[in-house]
Amino acid sequence: MNWANLLTSLNLASGTLAICLGDPYLGSLLIILGAIFDLFDGYVARLTKKDGPLGEQLDSLADVITFGVAPGVLYYHARPEELDPIFAAIVVIFLVAGTAWRLATFNVMPASAVFRGLPSPASGLFFASWLISIQYLESWFIGLHANPAIYLALPLIFAALMNIRAPFFSAKNFSRKGREALPYLTLIILTTLYIVTRPLEAGPLAIFTYILLSVIFFPRNQTTDPK
């Protein structure tokens, strides 16, 4: 066990505890905590030169739990009252399967400067921040979440986004300069604006913005898939 694998295990523990609690609010906070551990385990692995195949596999398995199963379970528990639980379960299965498929693809593809398909942590963070937002009456998203059609569509949309071949820019390349740095800077500026003006909706809005910027700044010169 090294420091990177310890952080990955804490990511896994966060997702598992979120599932055990079954509370959309507290569980979503644990998913966000897991995302923080997930962010740092890669940096620590590269810094300590401990980024071997075992750590990579462990990281993906942890991500399936924290960014696939946990958001799916919590989203299911937060379904609209008038919605048949069977339909909620079906779309959650698609979300979890889409996350697992995305991470399996991630593991077998060569390294790239961009992601092919929405990264699973972005999907997990969307649902975590969405579920936190709807706990507050003044949130924009309460009415949207209460709409069964929108509720059912969101997991299907994100399952598809994670597995399309379109590129999404990676935080690993934040050091780029000139026009290549524009999507990163735009995302930072707009996310800061969301936090200041609409803090309850900042998380989902930031993920939507990330998706939109990836489409606008489509890196057509990237032809390989990400690791």
Question: What annotation goes with each model-predicted range?
Answer:
Residues 11, 15-18, 70-73, 95-102, ...:
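Helical transmembrane-bundle signal
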Residues 1-39, 180, 191, 203-206, ...:
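Topogenic membrane-insertion module of multi-pass membrane proteins
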Residues 1-8, 47-105:
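Multi-pass membrane catalytic core of lipid/isoprenoid biosynthesis enzymes
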Residues 17-30, 69-91, 130-150, 196-201:
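Helix-coil boundary and interhelical linker segments in multi-pass alpha-helical membrane proteins
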Residues 42-52, 98-117, 163-171, 215-223:
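C-terminal ends of transmembrane helices
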Residues 13, 36-44, 61, 65:
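Active-site His/Glu-centered metal-binding helix of metallohydrolases
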Residues 7, 27-34, 91-94, 98, ...:
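Hydrophobic alpha-helical transmembrane segments of polytopic
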Residues 116-227:
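C-terminal membrane-associated helical module and adjoining short loops/tails
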